[in-house]
Amino acid sequence: MKTRSEIENRMQDIEYALLGKALIFEDSTEYILRQLANYEFKCSHHKNIFIVFKYLKDNGLPITVDSAWEELLRRRIKDMDKSYLGLMLHDALSNDKLRSVSHTVFLDDLSVCSAEENLSNFIFRSFNEYNENPLRRSPFLLLERIKGRLDSAIAKTFSIRSARGRSIYDIFSQSEIGVLARIKKRRATFSENQNSFFDAFPTGYKDIDDKGVILAKGNFVIIAARPSIGKTALAIDMAINLAVTQQRRVGFLSLEMSAGQIVERIIANLTGISGEKLQRGDLSKEELFRVEEAGETVRESHFYICSDSQYKLNLIANQIRLLRKEDRVDVIFIDYLQLINSSVGENRQNEIADISRTLRGLASELNIPIVCLSQLSRKVEDRANKVPMLSDLRDSGQIEQDADVILFINRKESSSNCEITVGKNRHGSVFSSVLHFDPKISKFSAIKKVW
């Protein structure tokens, strides 16, 4: 965490930038003056300038260096020179970063700094109180208080960000992160590589990737199926495509299988040797060599398996944040949703709803796809064709609401072909694809055409 002086200096820099934009950009002025209050300013000069700008605006007077200086003199504020206003105007006009970065970005930064400062002050006071009476307070209670305040600060920061409205043009044109910039980069990526995955990742299945974008950054993706149909196999196969073929960083949180079991499935997938043969050790020299080669392949990849994951939602959320921060993962897989416990204990339906909302929020917050496996209710077993529907998602309709993409896997017991149905796609079309599935090696592949 930054020191308090570093936070204050950063806040004063942001105040300076915002007042400069208010001075030269009329479309920014009203918004900035409406969103801020004078007590939020750290620098007394900036606070006085803000008060004067607001007075001039409220009285229909132009906001210029001269008009602001005259009002400051009228209020007998003499601890600041007119040249400070002139420098503010000059920097706002000549600094490319100040001109290109939207005022809403600066406002967001200011709210984050404010939350960071409040949290820093709280931690400082809490440790002082604990050091004065170490025997009267539990260190675990202190940590719990800090954790609660941290969660509150994060929630407050994001609520402030989401509460601020932004014009359509601002969102469209904003510097390097606006909609126009993203569309141009997508076009450049498509022209260069003939694919549409600038801000998304291919699943590795051409038929699916040609029809729609599944693993877009920020997407909350659900893979749902009946037991023993291939949910975990599809997730592992997709993760291998990402980590090995595409050289992406992948996090896999398994609440059901051990790390060793997952790695054996990965080895079976890469070598084409059945999981049963690997378990028995019934391998030829050539097969053992293939296993060793697969080991070298995965050694070069960034595939992180967390099989000792706690079942509590808050601990899983912390683990995901840590994987993103420390290991810079691009995609997270969770196996599976119904094994997670939430502190909302009124009933299981409310628990699942809380879990779904939290994972959806994490995908958006961390700007990565989070793929979560889910069970289906027994209703699908009662239907003759056993084709899954959105209403079959187990325990909560909230999953259907929160998910950006929902994939269903359907396979007849006697068939080696699986139908992958996109039952929901918030940002694209729904469709179906058929893949070949080899359960012995947990591998999905395109169906070979017979000519």
From Swiss-Prot:
ATP binds at A225, R226, P227, S228, I229, G230, K231, T232. This is Probable plasmid replicative DNA helicase. It catalyses: Couples ATP hydrolysis with the unwinding of duplex DNA at the replication fork by translocating in the 5'-3' direction. This creates two antiparallel DNA single strands (ssDNA). The leading ssDNA polymer is the template for DNA polymerase III holoenzyme which synthesizes a continuous strand; ATP + H2O = ADP + phosphate + H(+). It comes from Chlamydia trachomatis. The keyword Isomerase applies. Belongs to the helicase family. DnaB subfamily. A replicative DNA helicase, it participates in initiation and elongation during DNA replication. Travels ahead of the DNA replisome, separating dsDNA into templates for DNA synthesis. A processive ATP-dependent 5'-3' DNA helicase it has DNA-dependent ATPase activity. The plasmid this protein is encoded on is thought to be required for growth within mammalian cells. Homohexamer. Pfam families: DnaB (PF00772), DnaB_C (PF03796). GO terms for molecular function: ATP binding; ATP hydrolysis activity; DNA binding; DNA helicase activity. It is an enzyme of class 5 (isomerase). Changing A188V: In plasmid pCHL1. GO terms for cellular component: cytosol; primosome complex.
